[in-house]
C-alpha cells in the first residue's frame, strides 16, 4: 500500500539527520516560548517592557541620583538599554543552556536524539526574546531622536558573533553541570560579578587605566561595544573590534564543543 502524503513527508524529513534535529529544535523553541508567557496577561509584551523599565530605573539611578554624565555618550538611555539587552541575551542563553541537559533527562533516556540540540535550542530561544527587545530599542531611538544609519544592517553579524559565543558557553556549562551541580550556583555569582565588570550602566571612562586594559579579556565588553557602535554611534565597528568578537566566539565554541562532545556519552549515567 502506498504511503500517504503525510507519511511520505515525514519520512523524507526524518531521513536527513540535520532536518530531524532542526525540526526538534523548532518544536522545543515553540514549547519554551508558550510556557514562558502562559497565563501572562501581557504575554510577549514583557520582552519589550522589561528592558524599557530596566533602562528607566538605571537612567534615574545613574543620572539623577549619582550625577553621572559623559559628553562622549550621545544618549545615556540608549547606551544603557543596548548594554542591558546584550548582557541579558548572554545571561539567559547560558543559564537556560546550562540546565538544558538535566531538564530534558527523561527525553534523553527514552529517545535516541542528538544531545547538542538542547543547548542550541536554549540559545535560539533567548535570541527570539532578544529580537523583541529590539522593539524597545527602536522606541528609545525614536524618543531620544537618534536615527539608525546604514551600519544598523550589521545587526545580523552581531547576532552571529554573540550567538556563537553563547552556544559555546552553553555547551560547556550544560556538560559540566551534569557532573557538578554546584556550577548552577557558582554561575549565578559569576554573572553578577560579570555584570558589574562590564560597562553596561556606566562609561568605561570612569575606570582606572589598569582595569580598562583588563576589559580586553572580557568578551561581553567587545559585544556590547559592537552593538553600541552600530546603533548608538552609527559607525562601522573597527577591524580590531570585529577581530576580538570573532576570536571570543570561536574560542568559546571550540572549547564548549570539545568538552561537550567528549563527555556526552556519559550524560546518561549522571542525569
Where are these regions (language model features)?
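Hydrophobic transmembrane alpha-helices and immediately adjacent juxtamembrane helices
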Residues: 1-271
Amino acid at each position: 500500500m502506498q504511503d500517504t502524503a503525510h507519511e511520505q513527508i515525514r519520512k523524507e524529513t526524518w531521513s536527513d539527520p540535520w532536518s530531524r534535529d532542526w525540526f526538534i529544535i523548532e518544536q522545543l523553541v515553540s514549547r519554551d516560548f508558550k510556557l514562558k508567557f502562559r497565563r501572562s496577561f501581557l504575554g510577549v509584551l514583557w520582552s519589550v517592557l522589561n528592558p524599557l523599565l530596566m533602562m528607566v530605573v538605571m537612567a534615574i539611578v545613574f543620572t539623577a541620583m549619582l550625577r553621572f554624565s559623559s559628553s562622549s555618550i550621545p544618549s545615556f538611555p540608549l547606551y544603557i538599554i543596548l548594554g542591558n539587552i546584550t548582557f541579558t541575551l548572554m545571561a539567559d542563553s547560558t543559564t537556560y543552556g546550562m540546565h538544558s541537559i538535566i531538564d530534558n533527562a527523561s527525553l534523553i533516556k527514552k529517545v535516541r536524539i542528538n544531545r547538542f540540540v538542547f543547548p542550541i535550542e536554549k540559545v535560539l530561544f533567548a535570541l527570539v526574546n532578544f529580537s523583541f527587545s529590539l522593539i524597545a530599542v527602536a522606541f528609545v531611538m525614536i524618543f531620544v531622536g537618534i536615527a539608525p544609519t546604514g551600519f544598523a544592517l550589521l545587526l545580523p553579524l552581531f547576532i552571529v558573533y554573540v550567538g556563537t559565543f553563547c552556544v559555546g558557553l552553553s555547551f560547556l556549562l550544560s556538560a559540566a553541570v551534569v557532573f557538578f551541580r554546584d556550577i548552577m550556583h557558582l554561575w549565578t555569582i559569576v554573572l553578577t560579578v560579570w555584570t558589574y565588570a562590564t560597562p553596561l550602566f556606566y562609561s568605561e571612562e570612569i575606570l582606572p587605566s589598569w582595569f580598562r586594559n583588563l576589559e580586553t579579556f572580557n568578551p561581553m565588553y567587545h559585544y556590547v561595544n559592537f552593538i553600541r557602535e552600530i546603533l548608538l554611534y552609527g559607525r562601522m565597528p573597527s577591524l580590531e573590534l570585529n577581530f576580538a568578537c570573532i576570536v571570543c566566539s570561536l574560542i568559546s565554541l571550540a572549547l564548549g564543543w570539545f568538552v561537550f562532545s567528549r563527555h556526552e556519552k556519559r550524560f546518561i549515567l549522571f542525569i
